[in-house]
Amino acid sequence: SGDYLHYGLFTGVVVDLDTALAKRTQELEDVTICTTMWSYAEPPAVLQADPKAEHFHYASSHFTPIERKCNKAGNCWFLPVQFRENTKFYEECRPTFDVAMLQVAPMDKSGNFNLGPQVAEYWGILRNSKKIIVEVNENMIVNHGFENYINISQVDYVVEGSNTPLPTINAKEANDVEKKMAEHIVKLIESGSTLQLGTGGFPNYVGKLIAESDINDLSVHTEMFVDAYLHLFQAGKLTGNKKINKGKMTYTFAMGSQELYDWINDNQMMQVGPVEYINDVDVISQNDKMVSVNSCLQVDLFGQVNSESAGLQHIGGTGGQLDYVMGAFKSNGGKSFLCLPSTRTLKDGTKESLIRATLP
């Protein structure tokens, strides 16, 4: 009771340890659990076991749809921090974790466990933890990069997990309006650009159109690595001929299909790294012709953009959108696109403008 825990990040959130902790619900109280994006289709076992949050206080710095539902139900809280600052936030601005838990790939011959397709803020968490428990998953992919291993000498306990398949996400198909937006954007992208594409049906459709175009000699420097880049690679569009991290596809975490994970696994072209480097505006801007493509929720006539919340309901989190907008702005020949339909249709069939005179 009273412990402060971290559950891991993205595809590295723990499964078997979560299940084991949930079985102890009635004997524990005042246990705080932090994570970034619970990525599985079902809520964490601790939330299912404690729907009224009487024993566990669960907080995420970036909501998934499951976490949004739990937030509405009253047993999941939002942890407000900008993604790029998470490493420093956990290491310097939060209490020391009693236990950090994370899923990892099996140990290699050097005694290292690969962190899988995410580094993000891991080391801010791990450096500020009294105990570290790794849950070994034979399905966890090996992702090359930097700061992407933890050695057995740094680990207190090793749990051989049940080898749960990695969580996958399948982007929705772009609708007709999004397809038209994508057509406008692709006309403005030049050969030799470095790409950051957001997630969802719209950015994926942008990637599809680029793959079908005569644009070539492209590179990748992005927060989230998604299936769109796989399709661009298959189309022969990616050369990695950028100014920094040449020949590498650079990102801080990856999520997508199993096909994407299979491509990433033990692929020397991949470069996953810590978020404070990957999302650093000064690093991003070193790439010439940096192109950032993201969606937003609302915009007003003063140029203010809302990309995070609908009223009092938080949608995701404070990710790297601003970092890539500014990185593209500072880049030589860079371009940034924030995209949204002009209207949305409400449940009663009426239309509402997403372009406001002023945002609240």
PLM region spans:
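Conserved alpha/beta enzyme-core scaffold
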Residues: S1-P360
